[in-house]
């Protein structure tokens, strides 16, 4: 039930994203134009998810900066280290929970990263192993235990991601022609949802959680594959039954013809 809820939430979030506003209408960018340029290329802006005020407070469309930053507008300016995770958690609650419970979670340690260390602040991109790997090496030496653990996590997730895509592709090809297989489509969605939970677990580098969610994803894929196996077995059985029936008809027709002669 939890996994189904996650899938429904992800669908709702994707459906709720709107077209972004014109950055020329955002007064903040008139002065902070470099930040505005970076933000306009981010996934946050391009998917219409947030604007300047969601992290900095204030009134983003107010040209008078005194009014835009006035008391009561929630203006905080540049968030402090202690505020960053909480701000991101307004949307990324699960990620924040994993992060704060992981090895990097103590923001008071200046050597520890914050959300923007890996994801940037304005130029936020979809997270990828390549993007994050470049950040890890800022603190961790190549070949260190920490990087080796990260490499194992990346390998596990990549392998499972390929599995999900392979099963999804095969099922998408067959399902339009085989109504019975359409019932297997949600299984792949659940597998994808479990994989997303595993990816979220990377914020805390929780290898046990990641392994458990990957296994959960794999179990759903096996169910989907079993549905396809059962479908083809049933199809072969039906073909044999049809062939036997036709043979029976042919034999009876032949016997009738012989008797008439």
Language-model segments: residues:
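Sec-dependent signal peptide recognition
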Residues: 1-9
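Short sequence/structural segments immediately N-terminal
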Residues: 16-257
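Alpha-helical transmembrane anchor segments
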Residues: 259-261
């Amino acid at each position: 039930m939890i996994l189904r809820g996650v899938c429904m939430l992800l669908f709702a979030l994707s459906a709720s994203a709107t077209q972004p506003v014109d950055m020329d209408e955002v007064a903040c960018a008139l002065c902070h134009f470099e930040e505005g340029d970076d933000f306009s290329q981010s996934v946050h802006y391009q998917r219409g998810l947030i604007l300047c005020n969601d992290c900095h407070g204030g009134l983003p469309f107010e040209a008078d900066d005194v009014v835009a930053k006035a008391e009561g507008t929630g203006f905080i300016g540049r968030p402090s280290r202690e505020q960053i995770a909480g701000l991101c958690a307004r949307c990324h609650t699960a990620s924040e929970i994993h992060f704060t419970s992981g090895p990097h979670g103590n923001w008071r340690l200046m050597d520890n990263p914050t959300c923007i260390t890996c994801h940037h602040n304005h130029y936020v991109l979809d997270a990828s192993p390549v993007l994050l790997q470049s950040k890890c090496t800022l603190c961790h030496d190549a070949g260190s235990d920490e990087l080796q653990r990260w490499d194992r996590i990346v390998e596990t997730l990549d392998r499972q991601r390929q599995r999900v895509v392979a099963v999804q592709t095969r099922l998408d090809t067959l399902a339009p022609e085989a109504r019975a297989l359409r019932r297997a489509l949600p299984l792949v969605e659940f597998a994808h949802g479990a994989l997303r939970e595993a990816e979220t677990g990377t914020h805390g580098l929780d290898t046990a959680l990641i392994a458990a969610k990957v296994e959960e994803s794999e179990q759903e894929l096996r169910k989907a594959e079993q549905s396809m196996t059962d479908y083809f077995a049933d199809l072969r059985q039906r073909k044999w039954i049809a062939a036997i029936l036709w043979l029976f008809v042919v034999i009876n027709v032949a016997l009738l013809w012989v008797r008439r002669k």
